[in-house]
Amino acid sequence: MANKWVYLFSEGNANMRELLGGKGANLAEMTGLGLPVPQGFTITTEACTQYYEDGREINEEIQGQINEYIVKMEEITGKKFGDKENPLLVSVRSGARASMPGMMDTILNLGLNETVVEAIAAKSGNARWAWDCYRRFIQMYSDVVMEVGKKYFEELIDKMKADRGVQQDVELTADDLKELASQFKAEYKEKIGEDFPDDPKEQLMGAIKAVFRSWDNPRANVYRRDNDIPYSWGTAVNVQSMAFGNMGDDCGTGVAFTRDPATGEKHLMGEFLKNAQGEDVVAGVRTPMPIAQMEQEFPEAFEEFVKVCKTLEDHYRDMQDMEFTVENRKLYMLQTRNGKRTAQAALKIACDLVDEGMRTEEEAVAMIDPRNLDTLLHPQFDAAALKAATPVAKALGASPGAACGKIVFTAEDAETWNARGEKVVLVRLETSPEDITGMKASQGILTVRGGMTSHAAVVARGMGTCCVSGCGDIVMDEANKKFTLAGKEYHEGDFISIDGSTGNIYDGIIPTVDATIAGEFGRIMGWADKFRTLKVRTNADTPADAKKARELGAEGIGLCRTEHMFFEEDRIAAFREMICSDTVEEREEALEKILPYQQGDFEALYEALEGCPVTIRFLDPPLHEFVPTEEDDIKKLAEAQGKSVEEIKGIIQGLHEFNPMMGHRGLRLAVTYPEIAKMQTKAVIRAAINVQKKHSDWTVKPEIMIPLSCDSKELKYVKDIVVATADAEIAAAGVELEYQVGTMIEIPRAALTADEIAKQADFFCFGTNDLTQMTYGFSRDDAGKFLDAYYDAKIFENDPFAKLDQVGVGKLMEMAIKLGKPVNPNLHVGICGEHGGDPSSVEFCHKIGLDYVSCSPFRVP
C-alpha cells in the first residue's frame, strides 16, 4: 500500500502528534470536537523527512497526494483554487511535534493573483480588503519562500504612509494598496530576477517546500539544540482555508490564553486587533487591544469564544494558547496548543489544576518543565533601591525578572559585548527570529512594538530572560544607535534597568538580588519528593554554596573540590612551598601549615550540611595550575624558599606538561606525593570528629573520593594510605566514626574494569566532564572551535559536554554499574559532572540505576 502523506483535519486526532505535528493534531482534535475550524489538510512530518531524503525535492507521489487533497478541500469549501468566481484562498503553516515559536513562518492569502484580486474585490464590494490581502501575500511569500528580507517591503510601506501623511497601515486606501502591490512585485522581480508567480499550485508547492526547508534553517537548529528537539522529527505542513480578519471593522484577529501565562491567574488573557490578520498580532507590528474589549466590539463572537475556551481547557486539562479570527462577526478557531508560560505561572497552574480536580499530584509534577525551574530563581531588583527609583516609562511586562545593563541595538552587538563580559539590555523596534542568539546573550529585552504574544515576549519567556515589550513612548533611531524616552536621549552603552514583571523601565543602574522561593514551588517540590527515587546532591566548595543548595532541597554534597580551597591568599603560599620543596620532610612541613585551613573548611561544610553526606574529592588538577606566573610572585616564592629566582623558574618549567588534562593529576599526584593524600585525610577525619562531638544527633559520615583512577591496583595503593591515616586519627581520638572511600569513574578504562575497581571502592561517582573528554578525545576547552561545523554537517545535534551522550559515554556508565554492583552489592553510584543538572541526562541516570545526581546549587530543584 502506498504511503499516506496527507490527512484531512477530519481524519486525524490529538494522538497523531508525531505524524501531524502539534498544530495539525490539534486542528484535527478541534474539528472532532465540533468547533468552528476553517477546514484543510496536513502534510505529514514523514513527508518532510522524505523531502530531505530526496535531496530537498517534493517527490511526485507526495505532490500527487497534495493535488488530490486540494480537490477534496475544494469539495468541502465549495470554492476552487485560482477560480475567478469563487476562489479558494489558503494559509500555509508549519507545525512540528513540539512548538517552536517564530521558527517557521506563516504564509496567508495563498492563491491570489491579479485576476483573483479583481474578482474578490468586485464580489465582496471591498477593494481595500482584496488589495490588502494581495500585498500581504506578496510580502510573506517573498520573505518566507524566496528569502527576500521583510525590511525592503516595510520600507516601501513606511514611505507610502509618509507620502500619504498617515500613521497606520489601516489608513491606506484601496488605490494605495494596489500601488503597493505593484511596487512589491517590482521589488520581487529586482531581487529574484523573475516575475512573481501567478499560478496558485506553483505558489502552494513553493510554500510547502519553504516550510520543509525552514526545518533546517539556522535559527530552527539553535532552538532545537536548546530544547532537545531531534532533527529527525521533521515538521508537518498545514494547509487551511482562509478566514479573513481584515475585511473591515466587523472583522478581527486575536491570540488568547485561558489563563495568564505570566502569573498563572485563572482569567482569559490575550489581545485582539480589529481589521487585521493573525500575523499582525504575533509579529507585534501594531499594538493590539486587550481581549476583554472584544466583548464590546463583537458580543456574540466573544460569548462563543469564551465557551470554546472552556471546552478546550476542560478537554486538554491544561492552559491553552489559541489563535482565532472573526470574519463578518463569525468566530473561527485557527489553532490551540498547551500555552508556553513562565516558571511561576507553570507552578500556579499545576497546583490550581490539582485543586480544581483536573489533574493528580503526579500529573502536576510531570507538567513542570525542569528547565524552567532555573527561571524561578530569577534576579529581582533590590527592594530598597527600587523604592528610591522612579520609572521613566511603563510598557508590558512580558517575561518576568529584573535586568540591568548597557544598551545595545543589534543582536550581533549583544553577542559581542556579552562575550567580553559586559551585561547588556537589547533594545529593538521589535525582535524577529534572527535575533535569537543576541536575545540569549542579553540580561533583558526591551521592544518598542508588540504585545504579550509578540515574538520577543514568547521567546524571552521560553528562555527565562526578562522582557518588556510595546513601549510606544520610545522614539527610535536605530541607524545612529540611540533613542529618546521621557525627554532623555539614550545612546549605546548607557545603562538602563527593566522589570519584566511590572513592565517598568528605569534610567541607570538598579542593583538586582537573587529571588526567593514562593509557596507553590514548595508544594510541587513536596509532591516531586513523594514520587522520585533518585537523590539530589549538590556540587559545592564553600559553606555559602552548600547552605544555598540545602535551602533548595539538596540532600548532601556530591562533589566538593578541595583544590579551590588552596587558591585562597593565606594557603596558596604554603602550597607553593610544598610544590617547590626538595624533600618529603619539607613537603610535610609545608602541608602542615595548610592542614588547619583545610580542616576548618571541612568543619564549616559539615555544619552547613547538618549531617547530610559530604563527598570530598581529593586534589585533582596538575600542580602547574598552582604555581605563580607573575615575576613579583616568583620572587616572593624564591625568597620564602631560600632559592634563586632561576631555580624557582626551573621548577615551574619542569611542571609544564604537553597535555595536562591527561597528565600528572588526580590520584597520580597521591601516588607520587602520598603526603598530600595523608594531609587531606587528616583534615577530613579531624573535622568530622569535631563536628560529630558538637552535634551528637547528626551522623557525620565523610565520603572520600579519589579522582581519576584507571586501575584497581593504583586505587588500592592510594586507598591503603587513606585508610591507614584515617584509622590512626580515629584511634588517637578514641571515638567511633564511619567513613567511606570511593573513586571517580572518568577514564574509559575505569568503566571497562569496574568489576575490579569495585572491590576497592565503597562508591563510584561518574565525572562525566572528563569521561566525555576521554571518550571522545575532545578537549572541553577547545571543542567549541569545531562543534559548530559538526552541528551544521548534522554529525552532532548537541554539545556532548552539555547533554550527556547516552550512546557512547552512557554505555560506559551502564557497563560500570553492571560490572560493579554484582561484585560489591553495597556500592552506591552517583554523577557529579555538569550533566547532573541537565533534565534529559538525569532521566538517563535514573534509567540506568544511579542512586543520586549532583549538580550546581541553582539546578537542584
Model-found features: residue ranges?
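Nucleotide/phosphate-binding sheet-loop regions of phosphoryl- and nucleotidyl-transfer enzymes
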Residues: 1-389, 416, 422-425, 432-437, ...
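Short beta->alpha connector loops at strand-helix junctions that form conserved
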Residues: 41, 448-450, 469-472, 560, ...
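Conserved alpha/beta-domain cores
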Residues: 93-94, 517, 527-860
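Flexible inter-domain linker/hinge segments
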Residues: 208, 215, 377-408, 523-529, ...
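Structural motif
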Residues: 238, 408, 425-427, 446, ...
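Glycine-rich phosphate/ribose-binding loops and adjacent secondary-structure elements
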Residues: 329-332, 429-440, 444, 452-458, ...
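Extended, non-globular alpha-helical segments
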Residues: 394-434, 485-523
